[in-house]
Amino acid sequence: LVTVDCSDYPKPSCTLEDKPLCGSDNQTYSNKCSFCNAVVDSNGTLTLSHFGKC
């Protein structure tokens, strides 16, 4: 199981860093920050599928 620590999130703004992650919703997130913000928004239902684009 691949996991990302989102305990420091949500954050009000994310950098434009390009390190894509693929979520369990089959959506590509540009970086950990945007992914973790989405995880918080989903109340923890969103998980990491894998690193890289979906």
Curated annotation (Swiss-Prot):
Keywords: Disulfide bond, Glycoprotein, Protease inhibitor, Repeat, Secreted, Serine protease inhibitor. SUPFAM superfamilies: Kazal-type serine protease inhibitors. Residues 4-54 form the Kazal-like domain. The keyword Cell wall biogenesis/degradation does not apply. Coiled coil: none annotated. InterPro entries: Bifunctional_prot_inhibitor (IPR051597), Kazal_dom (IPR002350), Kazal_dom_sf (IPR036058). PROSITE patterns: KAZAL_1 (PS00282), KAZAL_2 (PS51465). It comes from the Eukaryota. One of its GO terms (cellular component) is extracellular region. The keyword Coiled coil does not apply. This is Ovomucoid. It comes from Megapodius freycinet (Dusky scrubfowl). The lineage of its organism: Eukaryota, Metazoa, Chordata, Craniata, Vertebrata.
